[in-house]
């Protein structure tokens, strides 16, 4: 088992918490992390690019001149690709760039980035984040008490809406529920702050 410090909301230490070594103590695999980040970034692409082919360009229904007898090359439409203002041939069309990796690869990538955060001592566990009202100032004070000042990913239990609202206006802070934990967000953050209930949810899914 891997052990890390457990903090209270006020920043004081509240003992240690044992982490599942099968999740937080694996040998980080950079290759699967790279492949997973590529997959996630590809899925973020809108893919709405499009051009007009000759059938989509307005006009061009009438043959510009008769087929024979003019001495000019035969033409059937002023919207053919060789004409200025004509349609585009083999241009981009709307498409989805998303694809899926095998589940075992995705799970290994998630375990790898979590284990790397533990190795880098950038993994902070808090026993809970409870607020009476969604106050940004109070959430910022909690992070300051935890000595977290860099780009941070905060992972909350799925039903902690108040804390999520309290952090949404903070720069360099991203809040996600435990069920939304992903490789790209973890790798992009300098610090990962997770509540103990959220940690239990993550271990339940990945164990």
UniProtKB/Swiss-Prot annotation:
<dbReference type="GO" id="GO:0019843">
    <property type="term" value="F:rRNA binding"/>
</dbReference>
<dbReference type="GO" id="GO:0006412">
    <property type="term" value="P:translation"/>
</dbReference>
<feature type="region of interest" description="Disordered">
    <location>
        <begin position="49"/>
        <end position="77"/>
    </location>
</feature>
<dbReference type="Pfam" id="PF00573">
    <property type="entry name" value="Ribosomal_L4"/>
</dbReference>
<keyword id="KW-0689">Ribosomal protein</keyword>
<comment type="subunit">
    <text>Part of the 50S ribosomal subunit.</text>
</comment>
<dbReference type="GO" id="GO:0003735">
    <property type="term" value="F:structural constituent of ribosome"/>
</dbReference>
<dbReference type="InterPro" id="IPR013005">
    <property type="entry name" value="Ribosomal_uL4-like"/>
</dbReference>
<protein>
    <recommendedName>
        <fullName>Large ribosomal subunit protein uL4</fullName>
    </recommendedName>
</protein>
<dbReference type="InterPro" id="IPR023574">
    <property type="entry name" value="Ribosomal_uL4_dom_sf"/>
</dbReference>
<comment type="function">
    <text>One of the primary rRNA binding proteins, this protein initially binds near the 5'-end of the 23S rRNA. It is important during the early stages of 50S assembly. It makes multiple contacts with different domains of the 23S rRNA in the assembled 50S subunit and ribosome.</text>
</comment>
<dbReference type="InterPro" id="IPR002136">
    <property type="entry name" value="Ribosomal_uL4"/>
</dbReference>
<dbReference type="GO" id="GO:0005840">
    <property type="term" value="C:ribosome"/>
</dbReference>
<dbReference type="GO" id="GO:1990904">
    <property type="term" value="C:ribonucleoprotein complex"/>
</dbReference>
<comment type="function">
    <text>Forms part of the polypeptide exit tunnel.</text>
</comment>
<comment type="similarity">
    <text>Belongs to the universal ribosomal protein uL4 family.</text>
</comment>
<keyword id="KW-0694">RNA-binding</keyword>
<keyword id="KW-0699">rRNA-binding</keyword>
<keyword id="KW-0687">Ribonucleoprotein</keyword>
<feature type="compositionally biased region" description="Basic residues">
    <location>
        <begin position="60"/>
        <end position="71"/>
    </location>
</feature>
């Amino acid at each position: 088992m891997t052990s890390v410090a457990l903090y209270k909301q006020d920043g004081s230490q509240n003992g240690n918490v044992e982490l599942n070594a099968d999740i937080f103590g694996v040998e980080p695999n950079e290759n699967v992390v790279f492949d997973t980040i590529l997959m996630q970034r590809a899925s973020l692409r809108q893919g709405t690019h499009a051009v007009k082919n000759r059938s989509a360009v307005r006009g061009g229904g009438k043959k510009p001149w008769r087929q024979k007898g003019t001495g000019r090359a035969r033409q059937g439409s002023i919207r053919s690709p060789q004409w200025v203002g004509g349609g585009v041939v083999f241009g981009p069309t709307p498409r989805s760039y998303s694809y899926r990796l095998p589940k075992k690869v995705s799970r290994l990538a998630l375990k790898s980035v979590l284990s790397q955060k533990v190795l880098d001592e950038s993994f902070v566990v808090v026993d809970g984040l409870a607020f009476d009202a969604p106050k940004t100032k109070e959430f910022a004070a909690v992070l300051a008490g935890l000595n977290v000042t860099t780009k941070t990913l905060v992972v909350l239990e799925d039903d902690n809406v108040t804390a999520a609202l309290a952090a949404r206006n903070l720069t360099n802070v991203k809040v996600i529920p435990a069920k939304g934990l992903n490789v790209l967000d973890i790798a992009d953050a300098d610090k990962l702050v997770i509540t103990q209930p959220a940690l239990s949810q993550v271990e339940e899914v990945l164990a």
